[in-house]
A protein has these predicted regions:
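Metal-dependent enolase-superfamily TIM-barrel catalytic cores that perform enediolate-based chemistry
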Residues: 112-232
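Structured beta-strand/loop patches that form or line metal/cofactor-binding pockets in enzymes
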Residues: 1-45, 49, 325-332
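Metal- or metallocofactor-binding catalytic centers and their adjacent structured scaffolds
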Residues: 36-105
Length: 373
């Protein structure tokens, strides 16, 4: 079963109003998809993270020539060569190969992996809380309320991009509006030191209904995380940009995190992503994969999560939630998968089990104009 054709789909969506996190505001969202087709006409889609012009050049210049003629079932021999060059490229190719193999076997993704343990997965609405507007706090709270009205009861909002006092005002106002009807996670995008992160205990202690405190510190600061975890009043989450399964080990061995957040697009392949999830289970941490970038990597995260044993016997079926981007982003509607009541049913059809919106794929195709990464 050889790869005959490789197509690229660089997609670009200009935002009506920039939004962002502690790293700054975004004016656009982008997505790079690939479609591999075998000689027998079996199709597999992949998603790659990165700057569109660079990804397109890499694929046209050497990835497509490298992939043409490769045997899908000999992935173990040649995918590591791609992983050595670029984890981002290899992640996308790995997804496409997985879909092709599942489709050939006549199985859904989860059945290819040995079967589903959870038929639906909870999702939390994820926000980019900042904007250039003076009334950004009110706008942020309105967005959370729109997700609440759509059935979400778990939300993640950003901190660390404004002063502590301003962020505190935002979060307290949000909790008051939610009236304890929803749980909130705070994501600082690695913007604090230990002392500043611990100032949040003041807010955590006088309100409840929290989920976790995400990446308060640079993720390399294992000692800082261990110290913070001993004193913080919320579970500490992190690891969305870690590049290998092994890079979770220092944090896990030191007991530095309560929750790990592997991201398939950073981990160079479907198998290393799934290994990271199981590694977390072996260490007894919770696992809530990071899935901000695109709908296909989110679908893989949902399916992989559905195959995990339960984290706890105490909370329903004990499976942790997955991130669901609830910001303005037309790329989110590219596949036919939407949450209902804060849950997403796992697709049962052959392969990835969802349909692509071909018209939207065409409409969102990047026109090649230059833009700042
Ligand atoms: Mg994060």
């Amino acid at each position: 079963m050889q790869i005959e054709k490789v197509e690229t789909f660089p997609l670009f969506y200009h935002l009506e109003e920039p939004y962002g996190d502690a790293n700054g505001l975004k004016a656009y969202r982008s997505l790079f998809l690939i479609r591999l087709v075998t000689h027998a006409g079996i199709v597999g889609w992949g998603e790659c993270k990165g700057w569109l012009p660079q990804l397109e050049t890499q694929f046209q210049q050497w990835v497509i020539p490298f992939l043409r003629g490769k045997h899908v079932m000999e992935e173990a021999r040649w995918l590591p060569l791609l992983q050595q060059e670029s984890a981002a490229l290899a992640a996308g190719v790995s997804m496409a190969l997985t879909e092709i193999k599942a489709t050939c076997a006549g199985l859904s993704l989860v059945d290819w992996w040995g079967g589903c343990r959870h038929e639906q997965i909870p999702v939390y609405a994820s926000f980019q809380s900042y904007s250039g507007r003076i009334d950004w706090m009110e706008r942020s709270i309105e967005r959370v309320e729109s997700a609440f009205d759509a059935g979400f009861r778990q939300f993640k909002v950003k901190v660390g991009g404004r002063t502590f006092c301003e962020d505190k005002k935002h979060i307290r106002a949000l909790q008051e509006r939610l009236c304890e009807a929803g749980e909130v996670a705070l994501d600082a995008n690695q913007s604090y030191d230990v002392g500043t992160a611990l100032k949040w205990n003041e807010v955590f202690s006088d309100q409840c209904h929290w989920m976790w405190f995400e990446e308060p510190l640079p993720i390399q600061q294992v000692d800082g995380y261990r110290l913070l975890r001993q004193h913080a009043l919320l579970p500490i989450a992190g690891g969305e940009r870690l590049p290998t399964t092994a890079s979770f080990l220092p944090l896990l061995q030191e007991g530095a995190l309560d929750i790990i957040q592997p991201d398939l697009l950073h981990l160079g392949g479907v198998e290393s992503f799934r290994q990271s999830l199981y590694l977390g289970r072996h260490f007894g941490t919770r696992i809530t994969p990071h899935t901000y970038d695109g709908p296909l990597s989110r679908l893989y995260a949902l399916c992989a999560q559905s195959t995990l044993p339960a984290w706890s016997k105490m909370q329903g079926d004990g499976i942790e939630p997955i991130e669901w981007d609830w910001m303005e982003n037309s790329l989110n509607q590219l596949i036919s998968l939407m949450p209902e009541g804060g849950q997403v049913p796992i697709p049962q059809g052959t392969g990835i089990g969802v349909e692509w919106d071909e018209e939207r794929l065409t409409y969102l195709r990047w026109d090649g104009r230059s833009f700042t990464p």
